[in-house]
Amino acid sequence: EDIQTPHLDAMAKASLRFERFYAAAPVCSPTRGSCITGRHPFRYGIYFANTGHMKPEELTLAELLKRHGYTTGHFGKWHLGTLTKTDKDANRGGPQGKEHFSPPQANGFDVCFSTESKVPTWNPMDKPKVDARRTWWDISDDTEPYGTAYWDEKGRRVTKNLAGANSRIIL
């Protein structure tokens, strides 16, 4: 049985529908940049995964939508620049990553709940403790901190209400 979505169906009928999408690059960062700019990676300067940052002069889809009254948000892996100038986050954040500071809020997004990189498909605050002899990881195994954090649109590290019955995050 199909799920009935009359509001989405009406919106799609009155809109431009894209039925095909081609990635701009074989890796994530340049493709993400192309999705939010509509431009080829060599035009905005991010050529490889987890390198570079969105330049301030680059116009994004979020900025265009804001001009037309939309509220914009980014949720999940950003991978288009660092999210903090102070804390060491993932593999590029912190004082060493200042030159690549380019969070979603500097690129037209009103709200965000984002990580600099590496959003796993399990608890995003944990990573498995593994050794080279193992070929899998069970979610019940021991974990350690993942090394990346969630950040909000004000540049604050999100630490509360991320998991369990008291979670206050709804997407």
Regions found by a protein language model. Give the residues of each.
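Formylglycine-dependent sulfatase
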Residues: 1-171
